[in-house]
Amino acid sequence: MLTMKDIIRDGHPTLRQKAAELELPLTKEEKETLIAMREFLVNSQDEEIAKRYGLRSGVGLAAPQINISKRMIAVLIPDDGSGKSYDYMLVNPKIVSHSVQEAYLPTGEGCLSVDDNVAGLVHRHNRITIKAKDIEGNDIQLRLKGYPAIVFQHEIDHLNGVMFYDHIDKDHPLQPHTDAVEV
């Protein structure tokens, strides 16, 4: 079981590396890693388990965050009342198209690898299309908008050595861009 001690923190060199593409089929170890990443998210969202093991709640985890520089992400976004939830383990995800319109979370973003709160708006694409493989090597295509699009972009950034705060405007950190949508 992954815990917070398995998650590397800001400043670790792996977080700034471009992660390696995975060859398919995945090895047994790679599959086990991806399943453990998803399990961490499930556990982190369970109040009792999270408290018992000191887990910070998360909706996404990228392999580089557990010091594995490979292009794998897990995303688990619970239903917010809209009837939609997102539960994906993706291999070699790529954003193949995106909107011009930007979106941002008014509270900014957080990250399991960043212990401090970093003030500032993180502008991302409001709509994206992702192509990836699932754990068995099947093709996946996702069209996402709003909060799910933001979460997937955050995780894919980790695969490219980018941290969320890299997107914050240093001169005007709390200023929304013109025409950007608050999510």
Swiss-Prot record:
Note describing how the cofactor binds: Binds 1 Fe(2+) ion.
Cofactor(s) annotated in UniProt: Fe(2+)
Catalytic reaction equation(s): N-terminal N-formyl-L-methionyl-[peptide] + H2O = N-terminal L-methionyl-[peptide] + formate
The entry's keywords: Hydrolase, Iron, Metal-binding, Protein biosynthesis
Enzyme class: hydrolase
Listed GO biological process terms: co-translational protein modification; translation
Residues holding Fe cation: 111, 154, 158
CDD domains the record matches: Pep_deformylase
Pfam families assigned: Pep_deformylase
Record-linked InterPro entries: Peptide_deformylase, Peptide_deformylase_sf
Gene Ontology molecular functions: metal ion binding; peptide deformylase activity
EC id: 3.5.1.88
Active-site residues (renumbered): 155
SUPFAM superfamilies found in the cross-reference section: Peptide deformylase (SSF56420)
Family membership noted in the UniProt record: Belongs to the polypeptide deformylase family.
Described purpose of this protein according to its UniProt entry: Removes the formyl group from the N-terminal Met of newly synthesized proteins. Requires at least a dipeptide for an efficient rate of reaction. N-terminal L-methionine is a prerequisite for activity but the enzyme has broad specificity at other positions.
Protein name: Peptide deformylase
Record lineage: Bacteria, Bacillati, Bacillota, Bacilli, Bacillales
Gene that encodes it: def
